[in-house]
Amino acid sequence: AEELNYMRKLTAESLDAGALGLSTGLFYAPGYYARTDEVIALAEEVGKRDKLYSTHQRDEGSRTVGLFVSLNEAIEIGRRSDCKVQISHVKCAAQKVWGKSYEYLQLLEDTVQEGIDIAGDQYPYTASSTALTGALFPRWSLSGGREKTLEFMADEDHRGRLVDEITDTFSKGRGAEGIIIARYVEDESLEGKTLIEIADIMNTSPAEATLRIYQ
């Protein structure tokens, strides 16, 4: 409670100093670990000042809580804090939710009709760009920062679990063939290659190649 009150104080001070609103990245660590009620507490300071709550929602497909659980969370934050809501980004990002665009947009429209000021942004291309950890790593493996993640990798059981869960993530999205490493300063020869190609070079599985790149 003490930490949350301090966060509210910092949020209020920043808004009063000219910040346009509050932004969260609930898809990413460490933002992912924030509870909904904690975000609402901060968003209340936004609502009091008629400013904007912008969120990279917790899940854009089927990685963790699911697309519609995530969208409804953003709506509930706006409803309970009385602030404007901006969704980043409006998309159905996993095969499991492909074809759900109408349902997604209808939920936004129904929310507007309810009186909640909600909108979203969308980029006009089929690829996305993010960190390898955000795209593939299970959230439990990131909770202690890079040092803890490396400890997990050094443990045989945890490494096996990581490989299994990353492999499962491939099956829910574009697959290892759909992920391209754009920048890798440790070995620039791997830049521009897919994880399938890199796994072939390393003579290992795509999930194991992912861990080696992170290390």
Predicted features and spans:
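Active-site neighborhoods of metal-dependent hydrolases
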Residues: 1, 7-28, 75-79, 83-215
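Hydrophobic, small-residue-rich alpha-helical packing segments that form membrane-like cores
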Residues: 1-80
